[in-house]
A protein has these predicted regions:
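Condensing-enzyme catalytic core mediating Claisen C-C bond formation in acyl metabolism
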Residues: 157-179
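Short acidic/glycine-rich loop or secondary-structure boundary segments that cap or lie
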Residues: 20, 152-154, 188-190
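Thiamine diphosphate
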Residues: 1-145, 150-151, 160-163
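Short, acidic loop-beta-alpha module within alpha/beta folds
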Residues: 53, 173-190
């Protein structure tokens, strides 16, 4: 919906097979750039677009968006404080069936080490939409970690204010001395 109102939003992708992007690719072809399997170049393109005043979203598989292009991310989005939002899919062992080259267990540490980064690991579609709304309203260098699977909504009653201030205790706690702290997909198990 945001692309319908703002032609200064660009979406870059390194993922050839993401059927979820088909509609976006067709409807907004002038704002959708397919960069091929070239994550490093894609981050350089993103930096150039951001330097021209655009809001840039970059999408790729987690292990390649993080480790493969970390220097470009650090120098562009990080050191120049550019409004680039990185969206990775298949975090953790999301693509374990593809072997260890597709594991993404270091991505959080990589981006946490870059000055000015904001890292988000949504647990469902609802919280993902809140994160996107926040980033579109306040463009900044950010990293969104998505699971490979579509996760059912776990907390559809949260508001933008809850998101901005942090989440509270869910459920009833009766004199128990236990705390479960989680995020992303694992929140469903808690």
């Amino acid at each position: 919906k945001s692309l319908e109102k703002d032609n200064k939003i660009f979406f870059l992708s390194a993922d050839f097979g993401a059927a979820a992007l088909d509609d976006l690719r067709k409807r907004f072809s002038s704002n959708f750039l397919h960069c091929g399997i070239s994550e490093q170049a894609m981050l350089d393109i993103a930096s150039g677009l951001a330097l021209e005043g655009n809001k840039v979203f970059v999408y790729a598989m987690a292990p390649f968006l993080s480790l493969r292009s970390i220097e470009q991310t650090k120098c562009g989005a990080g050191l120049m404080n550019l409004p680039i939002c990185l969206i990775s899919v298949g975090v953790g062992l999301g693509y374990a069936d593809s072997g260890p080259t597709h594991y993404s267990t270091e991505d959080y540490a990589c981006f946490r080490a870059i000055v000015g980064s904001s890292i988000f690991t949504p647990a469902d579609i609802f919280s993902t939409k809140l994160i996107a709304k926040d980033i579109l309203s306040n463009p900044k260098f950010s990293y969104i970690r998505l699971d490979r699977d579509n996760l059912p909504d776990i907390h559809p009653k949260i508001t933008q204010n809850d998101f901005n201030e942090g989440f509270k205790i869910y459920g009833k706690i009766e004199k128990k001395k236990i705390a479960l702290i989680s995020h992303g997909k694992m929140l469903h198990s808690c």
